[in-house]
Structures are given as structure tokens and as C-alpha cells.
A protein has these predicted regions:
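An acidic- and aromatic-residue-enriched active-site/binding cleft used to recognize and process polar
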Residues: 64, 93-97, 133
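Mg2+/Mn2+-dependent nuclease catalytic core
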Residues: 95-122
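Non-catalytic C-terminal interaction segments of nucleic acid-processing enzymes
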Residues: 1-25, 78-85, 123, 131-184
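Short beta-strand or tight-loop elements
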Residues: 68-70
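Aromatic- and glycine-enriched beta-alpha-beta binding-site module
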Residues: 89, 113-132
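Conserved catalytic cores of phosphodiester-cleaving nucleases, focusing on short active-site segments
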Residues: 72-100
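Acidic-basic catalytic patches of nuclease active cores, encompassing PD-(D/E)XK
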Residues: 1-66
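Structural alpha-beta junctions
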Residues: 38-56, 118-127, 147-156
Length: 184
């Protein structure tokens, strides 16, 4: 528990760089960017449709697992009993060091171990999307790839220079299972 609190304190300043003082976990810009890509990026629209399918009467809901859970969910709400059915989950993030071009020294897509709890023990589809610092480029990967990489490579404790601390990640190679999209 102490390690978790220490990590949060180290992450907070980086979050404030991305989202403003006092808003270290307010990723509204990334949520809006995902919606923009859905509306304006045909390749991403097709990828989304292929991955999640097209369940009828769904909406993109913020915080479908609660305030401190995953960012977005594809959900259907029943008119009969007000029950919500989750069809998929989406985590969004920003990589502050990624400007116009992806940093050449990064050879892996990192998925934070602490985010795996959002889908473990469920059958939900899951997509994690990382945006560049201008929200014009995005890379993402799926639950299936994360699980494959976790099985093949495990979880790695890595030094994260931006937060000056170690964090635990699943490292996914930048291969055909990591998808890249851009908008003008």
C-alpha cells in the first residue's frame, strides 16, 4: 500500500504537466481525442468496428466501472431494469514525450500492470490507446495482445525517467498487434 501511495505521488506531477495543476488524473482531453478519432478517422472507425463489433443501442460511457476505474466503456442500458451491459472497455492516456514523431528509442508499447485489473476475470473486450502530446496521433493495442505479451514476457519493473520511479509494465513489441492512427 505504501509503494502504491509513493507511486501516485510521483505520477501526479507528470499528470499535471499533461492536464494542468490539480488535474493530474483528468484525462478529458484524451477522452475527447478518442471521440474525435471515432468521428473523423476512417481507419480507426473500421478497426473499432472489427474489434468491438456493432452492438445495437450502445453509448460510449465515461467511467463505466466507477470514478477510479477504466476511462470509457461501450455500454447498453436496459430500459426495463436500468441495468448496464458492458460490451467493451477503453483506457486512454497521453505520452508527453511523443510529439510529431514517436520517440525512436521506444521499441515497446507499455501497458501498466495496475490497469490489467480492469479486464482480468471478465470477458470484456479491452483497448488501450495512447495519444501524442497534440492528440493528432494514437497507437493502441487490444486485450488479446496484452494477455499474449504478459504470457510470453511477463511483467517488467522498469525505471520511468519522467516520474523518477519504477513502475510495472507489460511490454508489447511494436509489431502488427499495435495499431497506429492519425488525424489532421
Amino acid at each position: 500500500m505504501i509503494r502504491s501511495q509513493q507511486l501516485k505521488q510521483k505520477i501526479k506531477p507528470q499528470g499535471e504537466i499533461a492536464h494542468g495543476i490539480g488535474n493530474s488524473y483528468a484525462d478529458h482531453s484524451e477522452r475527447d481525442a478518442l471521440r474525435y478519432f471515432l468521428a473523423n478517422c476512417n481507419p480507426f472507425q473500421q478497426f473499432w468496428k472489427n474489434y468491438f463489433g456493432t452492438p445495437p443501442n450502445t453509448i460510449l460511457k465515461e467511467d463505466p466501472l466507477g470514478e477510479y476505474g477504466v476511462d470509457l466503456g461501450i455500454v447498453t442500458k436496459s430500459n426495463i431494469n436500468n441495468e448496464t451491459t458492458i460490451h467493451g472497455l477503453i483506457e486512454v492516456d497521453v505520452f508527453n514525450s511523443w510529439g510529431e514523431t514517436f520517440p525512436a528509442h521506444y521499441k515497446k508499447f507499455h501497458v501498466l500492470e495496475r490497469k490489467l485489473k480492469y479486464f482480468e476475470g471478465t470477458n470484456y473486450k479491452y483497448l488501450t490507446c495512447t495519444f501524442n502530446n497534440t492528440h493528432t496521433q494514437m497507437c493502441c493495442t487490444t486485450r488479446e495482445n496484452i494477455e499474449r505479451c504478459n504470457l510470453l514476457y511477463g511483467v517488467t519493473e522498469m525505471w520511468m525517467p519522467a516520474i523518477k520511479s519504477h513502475d510495472r509494465v507489460v511490454r508489447c513489441p511494436l509489431d502488427e498487434n499495435v495499431f497506429w492512427f492519425g488525424v489532421a
